[in-house]
Amino acid sequence: MLEKFANIFRIPDLRKRVLFTLGLLAVYRFGAFIPTPGINSEALMQYFNANSQSALGLADLFTGGNLRKLTIFALGIMPYITASIIFQLLTVIYEPLAKLQKEGELGRRKITQWTRYVTILLAIVQSFAIGLTLTGSSANMVTIPRGAFIPMCIITLTAGTAFIMWLGEQITERGIGNGMSLLIFTGIVVGLPRGIMDLYGKARDSAWGAFTPIAIAILIVAMVAVVAFIVFVERSERRIPVQYAKRIVGRKMMGGQSTHLPLKVNSGGVMPVIFASSMLSAPLLFAGMSFFGSPKLQDTAFFGPILRAIQPGEPWYEILQITAIIFFAYFYISIVFRPDDIADNMRKYGGFIPGIRPGRRTSDFINDVLTRITLVGALYLCIITVIPTFLISGIHFNHLWLVGPVFDRLPTWMTNGLGVNFYFGGTSLLIVVGVAMDTVQQIESQLIMRHYDGFSPKSGRIRGRRSW
């Protein structure tokens, strides 16, 4: 295994890409130590510790702990993710954007440019909401006048978001892996030591009473089982057999071989979970916003019940999360995987699925198979996301309308969870394992392409023409 890792640095181009990626990730982490001016760090930390199981804890997970310290990268990559979701939805329902996307590289560049503009706009709105929330709080989290802090907060956080967006795009283009996913991955991994220390502190202080050993054992077993389950499903695929007919090209006989079309069970990877979590956590950032003396949104008669109902651990939040994950699983696969194009390419090169007519029938068959396995993949994402969250923060079944009193006798750990933070949740584990596997797979592809052995036992080196 050490020999295979050493191969990475023997290939100049791959070595350059890996070092470039690590360098930009280091720059991203350096920004976590630059606070926004005018912040009372101790008061802000106490506020976040008291609300670690709320939507703030989930939002802080995606920012790598930058939100709880309100650094220049406090918004993280969330505005960019939200903007990307908006434009991907628009390309489906708005015909001019759909045509622009089909124009090739020029059209995609135009959409990317608009996505950046919307990202900046969302960053301005979210930073304004954060400024209003902090200055309107009674916890004395701001040390300078409100009129000076809010513009400074908007400028600082928006500039930080623009820089993070640039970092992610540079990693994707010139580094290894998906830049945006790697930034989220880095933030979660860096926060794991703090999560472990919190877990140790709760166990030492007997915060869970007589059930401390059982609670820790359940958490460890659940995490190991979740990781193993993620690895198993992420490597699972449905293989559709494809046969290529023989044909004569010049003086050579081409085709005649049998192959397969691999369809991953979870073709969308971690993106449906990231999209769903981002969409659910973004509105909750406005919960504490107060417009110059008016009540906070979370205290108003209209928005208050809605915002409280979609907090993590609430039944409606889990229902919305499951619905959003299933929706984005199908939506994402409809964008990245087009059965019509695959069927046309197969027919063009003389390929066909045994028992299925080429053309429209092949496209329908691939679409049917993809629909079924995407449902399995979406349900897998829901299980991975919801069950660990149930163990960690619980689900408040007793808050359900009408049937709530039926659940009053449930054990406390089922309704309140074990009380640890989101770094041990299914969302974080799925992102960490999924992004790590995707990145390793890209490095492995680069190694095999250059005739080196990959990391997995089945990935032997590819022989060049000289060895035939």
Model-found features: residue ranges?
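N-terminal cationic and glycine-rich segments that engage phosphates or anionic surfaces
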Residues: 1-101, 105-468
